[in-house]
From Swiss-Prot:
CDD domains: F-box_AtSKIP3-like
GO molecular function terms noted in the UniProt entry: carbohydrate binding
Protein name: Putative F-box protein PP2-B6
Species of origin: Arabidopsis thaliana
InterPro entries, per the entry: F-box-like_dom_sf (IPR036047), F-box_dom (IPR001810), PP2-like (IPR025886)
Residue span, F-box domain: 42-88
Gene behind the chain: PP2B6
């Protein structure tokens, strides 16, 4: 817990809150840029000790900390404190950063982990923090999945892509079967968090067998029944109307040039219910035809409703 507040500090807080029934609101276009403009002139919050302000806002979220910077000059200065931002960093953050990397502050380190993912576990995963909440996000590399025919160069080839987070990604060459899956411990993720899971992929201009092909996908804890739904790597709006009984999750293009489709979700309780390993499944269950032209980056885990 944070530092306890003295009697004088608590009295000042009550005085400030009592004299400021309405605090001007500011929109935050980018959490990394802080809040809006600082309220001009003297603010009653300026009478609070800086360590008191830092202690208060350290119990909020990264988004709220950035917004609070616009309350007054005292708040704007207090939000730079390392003690605040260190609370938002994962406990293992020192092991995630190469020793040659130098950061000017814990705030600088926090936003670096948000916008510059790091490879962990010998390149098996890409790790970063969700900007507004500090929740952990993970992209599991395709090489950590089991892929039917994945080691057969007639069916799949492993290629280098400059836009990939990993050394190589698999490209489907020509195969009638499309089956892949894998599992991951939930210990690397944030506890008490509802996660959405996505398959991240690209389709090539030269492709066949994928158009409007329903792929059955699912996410669930190992040892439990896995809910099923469907995605389509190469979708046309007219054909998918013929799937009234299939729960089709729409794909969308990401800002990094990849495509993604949600394959399921789960709540990470840290294994309290006896399940701490989550499994994913991506299987074509409808077409025996030859297919080619899709590249798989991996499986991404991020807090639900996180963009």
């Amino acid at each position: 817990m944070g530092q306890k507040l003295g009697v004088d500090s608590r009295q000042k807080i009550r005085q400030v809150l009592g004299s400021s029934s309405k605090v001007q609101k500011h929109d935050v276009e980018s959490i990394g840029g802080g809040g809006g403009e600082i309220v001009p002139g003297h603010s009653p919050f300026d009478d609070l000790p800086e360590d008191c302000i830092s202690n208060i806002i350290s119990f909020t979220s990264p988004r709220d900390v950035c917004v609070s910077a616009s309350v007054s000059k005292s708040f704007a200065h207090a939000v730079q404190c390392d003690s605040i931002w260190e609370k938002f960093l994962p406990s293992e953050y020192e092991s995630l950063i190469p020793p040659w990397r130098v950061f000017s502050s814990k705030k600088d380190l926090y936003f670096t982990l948000c916008y510059d993912p790091v490879l962990v576990e010998d390149g098996k995963k890409s790790f970063w923090l969700e900007t507004a909440s500090g929740k952990k996000c993970v992209l599991l590399a395709a090489k950590e999945l089991w892929i039917t025919g994945g080691n057969n160069p007639e069916y799949w080839q492993w290629i280098e892509l400059c836009e990939s987070s990993f050394e190589k990604v698999p490209e489907l060459l020509n195969n009638r079967s499309f089956q892949m899956g894998g599992s991951m411990s939930t210990q690397i993720l944030s506890l008490g968090t509802h996660y959405s899971v996505y398959i991240v992929y690209k389709i090539k201009d030269e492709r066949h067998g994928l158009r409007d092909l329903p792929i059955q996908v699912g996410v669930g804890f190992k040892g439990q029944e896995m809910p099923k739904q469907f995605i389509c790597f190469d979708e046309s709006t007219d054909k998918t109307k013929e799937w009234p009984k299939k729960k089709l999750m729409k794909s969308k293009k990401r800002g990094d040039g990849w495509m993604e489709a949600e394959i399921g979700d789960f709540f990470n309780d840290g294994g309290l219910m006896g399940f701490d390993e989550v499994e994913v499944s991506i299987v074509d269950v409808t077409s025996p035809n030859l297919k080619c032209g899709v590249m798989i980056e991996g499986i991404e885990f991020r807090p639900k409703d996180c963009q």
